[in-house]
Amino acid sequence: MKNLVVITCITFAAALTVQLAAAKDPDISKLPPAAKKEGLVFDKDIKPLIENSCLKCHGAEKPKSKYRVDSHEAFIKGGESEEAAVVPGKSEKSPVIHYVADLVEDMEMPPTDKRDKYPKMTAEQIGILRAWIDQGAK
């Protein structure tokens, strides 16, 4: 009986490790390409994108997962995971890109069950967000 418990625990731990590794390394080959736009800035180019899809849940009042998107600094900083949401210069490593591109299971943004109210970003919009991040997220 003890052997069965040990084997079950080891199997569970191995499965969990595989799941966590997959969450940390999303398949970036599925990302839309970065837009070929130069000089993108947060207030003019990015804020309108996130206001439409993200602000209702991640605004100043009771932001989900303590992640606010209502300012440049907050958008980059991230939330309760204490991991930066944006890695300036590296959109492919930025968690916010993984979430809006639906690369992380159960972390799709906006959540799939809320997309009737809050639309998913289009591939073109994700490309603009990627270009802004790749240009330094200024």
Feature annotation, model-predicted:
Residues 19-138:
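Aromatic- and Gly/Pro-enriched helix-to-coil junctions and flexible linker segments
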Residues 1-5:
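Positively charged n-region of N-terminal signal peptides that target proteins for export
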Residues 7-17:
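Bacterial N-terminal signal peptides
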